[in-house]
Amino acid sequence: MVRIESLNHRGEGVGRVLSGPYEGLTVFVPGTVPGDVAQTFFVEKKKTFARAQVKRILEQGEGRVGEACPVASKCGGCSWQHMDYGVQLEWKTKIVEEAFHRIARVFDCEISPCVPSPKILGYRNKVEVPVAYENGQVVAGFYEPYTHNVVPAQDCLVEHPAVRNVIKHLLDQVRKRRYKVYNEKTGRGAVRHLVARVAPGTDEAVAVLVSTGHRLSGLNDMASELMESIPNLRSVVLNVNDEATNMIFGDRDYLIAGRPYIQDVFGSETKGSGSLGRLRFRISPRSFYQVNSYQAVNLYTTALSWAELKPNDVVYDVYSGIGTISLFAALRASFVVGVEEVEPAVKDAFRNARDNGIENVTFKAGKAARAIPGLLAEYPRPDVVIMDPPRGGAEKETLAAIADIKPRSIVYVSCNPSTFARDMLFLKERG
């Protein structure tokens, strides 16, 4: 038996074995909440810890609720759904605090409570689902935790309904045309992933088929049928990924029907004090865009509030994507420079600036660490640096370059408390 004492950043229960030869061993158990006493079985055993699955909950901790989705306990997408949302927010705040203390060694910083999302179901504007065979039929869903076993999930409740509809039609087309599914063990087959994205502010959608090659039969007919059957579908794209890799996308996109982007209207209604503003954004299939548009308004509003931008400020936006933060910052500052490694996203960013009539902003393509010295030679030194790196955090070279600039303030937007705390420690040690 295991008593669950806390949660880790994945939402897994962290507990200890209560008796027997492994008494006291730390165990990570998905699908549990603090206070649970569970009968479990090991799926992985190391010297100092183990991973386990639940056989039976013997005592329920506070905050346990029924899962809204029937496959939430099987797929790897919703590791917190068995928990009351208020309890989730409390523990997520604690996880950030723990990262500050354990990794960044910061103990005198006040951590604000988590801001709740306006929507907790039906919010996700993009989904990338692997495909596989099950009993001879093609299925699409999500990977079972710590495996590449696909759990079919056609009615995922966190997805925006329009996203769910696009995936359903894409899957129907793959089945109808009998496209072969890619097998990552043998390297054979064609279709790897189905991808859908919707712009909640306009309802425009894109459908992407990720394949090992571009010579699939009937692509034009498939695209025509999708465009006819899905309301507001603006793009059908084939992405080619012929590498032996776990990366979802390759670097080649083929537009089969429609236009190469969708447009979203994003932000709050007014541009007054304390309000984010409202802008229009073009989004290419592979460009980064916050998957919870509703919560992203809160995120960007908070980030820009903490930046305390002044009318004469120069801002560098590092990892700028399609220019979302850059353009909202440009409404408040004198000049903004965005740096982004993904070239299609940079092209989107320039178009977005033009579409919104914003002229006090520019963008540079390239790795941030290499680009920043060139920016300093071409533009004024920034008063504020805003950075929104991927889950793995920022590169040390990028952090060093930013530290050397010594801006008035750095606003770091993160989706991973552990790598954020690691990077904060680096910046703190650099002064």
Residue ranges and their predicted role:
Residues 35, 159, 292:
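Short, conserved phosphate/pyrophosphate- and ester-handling motifs at nucleotide-, phospho-/glycolipid
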Residues 13-19, 141-144, 208-210, 349:
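Short, acidic/hydrophobic/Gly-rich beta-strand patch recurrent on exposed beta strands
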Residues 196, 203-212, 279-284, 384:
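Short, aliphatic-rich beta-strand segments
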Residues 1-67, 71, 370:
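Terminal RNA-binding accessory module
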Residues 55-67, 73-181, 201, 216:
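Extended interfacial segments that mediate partner engagement and assembly in macromolecular machines
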Residues 1-3, 9, 13, 218-431:
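Rossmann-like S-adenosyl-L-methionine
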